[in-house]
Amino acid sequence: SDINSLKQMDVILTCQGGDYTSEVFPKLKAEGWDGYWIDAASTLRMADDAIIVLDPVNLNVIKDGLVNGTKTFVGGNCTVSLMLMGLGSLFQNNLVEWATSMTYKAASGAGAQNMRELITGMGYLYNNTKALLDDPKSAILDIDRQIAELQRGEGFPKANFGVPLAGSLIPYIDKQLESGQSKEEWKGQVETNKILGNQQIVPIDGHCVRIGAMRCHSQAITLKLKKDVALDEIEDMIRQSSQWAKVVPNTREASMTDLTPVAVTGTLTVPVGRLRKLNMGKEYLGAFT
């Protein structure tokens, strides 16, 4: 954070987190620095003079920004970016009237210490019920009762999440807003529309939930399309969304083997499956990614 050294740079690429950005960026600007700031933190995402970078989807917006003098480029929210990596072409082809996203967010989104805490919680439950688990005559209701007592007890590791995650879930992520949304849910609409450079806002809302997966966020998406589009056409558009998008056939076997965090972690694949028209009408599309 040596401002004198940093202001000599033409380009600064930072992955130091929001506190660093909040401290350093204003000081650099106050010193008259006019270089390119490329940032993984969320701090500057919604600034008027910043572009949210998702180049497989919004390269045209990025190029226009460069031509017009934009110098602040920021990475987007995880599930917003993943939704657009998989379904971006439906938005780009102006087919989406509105969307809901119900997210199943992994521990990794909360940070390294939270990932450790999830594993520690799993171990705590196992170690304290091992005697019953090893006894084939033990009743599962007794084990279940003991698990619940352990989760509610003072000894359960929850310093980072605040409540137990292992064997449970957390139906609220980030700050509480006056709208009733969490901040994580608010990001869905504002960031999607900013990434795409939309002049007319596409309404997006949903619920963001933390689950006991280590990595790979998942989301169940409902899209209200502006017209009836055949599923095979939709699948072709998804394949064109990015080179990493993969259509998973809507079968039980394919969904269970190819559409899970276990299948995807460690890869760059963005699988999109459970694609089907919903009972509400032919313009309603369900997806899981």
Question: Regions from the language model: what does each represent?
Answer:
Residues 1-160, 201-203, 227, 236, ...:
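N-terminal Rossmann-like NAD(P) cofactor-binding subdomain of oxidoreductases
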Residues 285-289:
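Short, well-ordered beta-strand elements
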Residues 130-262:
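Contiguous C-terminal substrate-recognition/catalytic subdomains in enzyme active sites
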